[in-house]
Amino acid sequence: MAELHLSFPAYSLCWINNHQMAVGGGGGTTKSGVKNKLKLLSYEDYEPEVGEGHTKFIEHGEIELKHSDDAVMSLGYFKNELIAGINNTIDGKLIDHLRLYGRKDKLFEEKNALRLTDFDNDEQYQRLCLFEPLHDAICISCTNKSFFIISKNDHKVLFEKHGSDVYDVSSTEDKLAIAVDDRVEIYDWNTFELVQVLYMPVERATVRGVSFLPNQSIVAAYNYIKDSKRFASLVRFDYSSKNQLWRFGMIRDLKNAKGVTCFCCDKENGMIIVAGADCSIRFMSLDLTKLSQVYKHSLPVTDMQLSPDSEALVSVSADGLLCLQFVGKFKNLSAVKLEDAGVILRLSLMFPFVLAILYFYLQLLFPDEKLDAIHRFFSFILHIFSKYTIRNYDL
């Protein structure tokens, strides 16, 4: 675990390799004096000759932004190319919102800028930019309810959707899952034909994250409103090879989360990570069991990403705090399914031990009060048995 306090509010990040990352943010168009920045960082493990080792951050510099640039609101990286959601406004008119940077020595330099849509006001921005390496495509989502998939090579628009809020996307070789408003829409990657729509199991839901899992399952993280309060849940849909459709698998409420702010997932092992509005980060397994829960941020997480090898998680918040956590142990545990051995097996394993304790209890401690002692003994055993064998799924 390592922390770094940045000099600016952080809203976005992406990994460049297993040890290097880009972090973006800033004060926006306000007159706060906080500059809008796109910074490159890396970390390394330091092992001194004497004392305990620790992780330290190394700053590699900043990518120069234009004077008219807004805060960096989204980031993505693939094969020496960095993409960013940065509004550029001159005289109140939006010029562009998608930046493409290429490698130059140890930093990056801007090589192109695009505008795919027009914003109605200064509050709208590009919330998502994500490379899809399997298809050489870039997914772009903006807060004016517009979504685009463009070619990485010539930036031609391959697919677009308007009138809905898109928060996240996930893909396989032939399928595309989009978190759209209160549902997950699944498309065929080759034709962009709608294959299936998966609705959340509650009303007034907003899907904030989606990902494919092993065995073609799909997990979605969503918020919902009930009695004027906001709650958070996970739902898993399992694929039926017979019907070639996804069916409802299981649901898990995230107690006290107060909503989902960020979501990421390790597709290979099934590790699910959810950041809540209560400033928590939850690590979940493939069967939606909570593995761990940590509180490292004082403000809700604005972005978090797994390293390419899924060994480290980096998260940022609007107070400029960057946290690095090593999560390899959760990755290994996420695919392990803990089976209930059953009451009969547990009793058979405990029986010899219980008999030995009973003999000691009666013969040595209470030789003249055997009936009362037997009653007290079995009451005690029943209490211990029920306490440690009844499983609690309340997360």
Curated annotation (Swiss-Prot):
WD repeats lie at residues 250-285, 290-326. SMART domains: WD40. Residues 368-395 are lumenal. The keyword Lyase does not apply. Its main location: endoplasmic reticulum. It is a single-pass type II membrane protein. Coiled coil: none annotated. Residues 1-346 are cytoplasmic. It is found in: Endoplasmic reticulum membrane; Golgi apparatus, cis-Golgi network membrane. GO terms for cellular component: cytoplasm; endoplasmic reticulum; endoplasmic reticulum membrane; Golgi apparatus; plasma membrane. One of its GO terms (molecular function) is guanyl-nucleotide exchange factor activity. SUPFAM superfamilies: WD40 repeat-like. InterPro entries: Sec12-like, WD40/YVTN_repeat-like_dom_sf, WD40_repeat_dom_sf, WD40_rpt. Keywords: Endoplasmic reticulum, ER-Golgi transport, Golgi apparatus, Membrane, Protein transport, Repeat, Signal-anchor, Sporulation, Transmembrane, Transmembrane helix, Transport, WD repeat. GO terms for biological process: ascospore formation; ascospore-type prospore assembly; ascospore-type prospore membrane formation; endoplasmic reticulum to Golgi vesicle-mediated transport; protein transport; regulation of COPII vesicle coating. Required for the formation of transport vesicles from the ER. This function involves the cytoplasmic domain of the protein, which is thought to interact with the small GTP-binding protein sar1. PANTHER family: PROLACTIN REGULATORY ELEMENT BINDING PROTEIN, PROLACTIN REGULATORY ELEMENT-BINDING PROTEIN. This is Membrane glycoprotein spo14. The gene is spo14.
